[in-house]
Amino acid sequence: KVMNKYMNIVDKPAVDGYDIITTIDVGIQDIAEKALVDQLKNLNAVWGVAIVMDVATGDVKANVNMTRGADGNYYEMKNLAVSNLMEPGSTFKTASIMVALEDKYITPDYEVDTQSGIVNMHGSWMRDWNWHRGGYGKIDVTRILEVSSNVGVSSIIDKFYRDNPQKFIDGLRRMSIDKPLNLG
């Protein structure tokens, strides 16, 4: 079932091999799919990914990948979470915000002026994806994560860790972000 439509399934004869065990929860998958599509429409985004993980066990409860088709509707075309090669920027934004929250420098309603979506940070231009449309202006941390604002996250980290970058690195290490996952 994808986007409330049942797809044709091609039955193939079973082949002996290993058992596959999934941790996907169909109810959570449906909720995540609806939430992702709602946000994709709200943001007029081309594609998006939502993954829900049980942090206590590491079990993936939902993995939703939606891409806008030529007709303007969203479809699950491929697993973007594992197939697209990209910099870890947006993932790292969440970790960066978590460090600043844990260090009690910010709260979810802390506001940052992202200006017109483009700012000069130490001689380099930092841009939000929509800078050519005027950016976001003043937004809170929740909105910074929602729209994946480069300017917002960078401004927070620069303001609170500029004089002590090691404290930021230590915060990331508290999350074991520097440890291998040993998935192989």
Tell me the role of every PLM-derived stretch.
Residues N4-G48:
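Conserved, well-ordered alpha-helix/loop/beta-strand core segments that scaffold catalytic motifs
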Residues V2-D11, I24, G48-M86, M98-G184:
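Beta-lactam-recognizing serine transpeptidase/beta-lactamase-like catalytic domain environment
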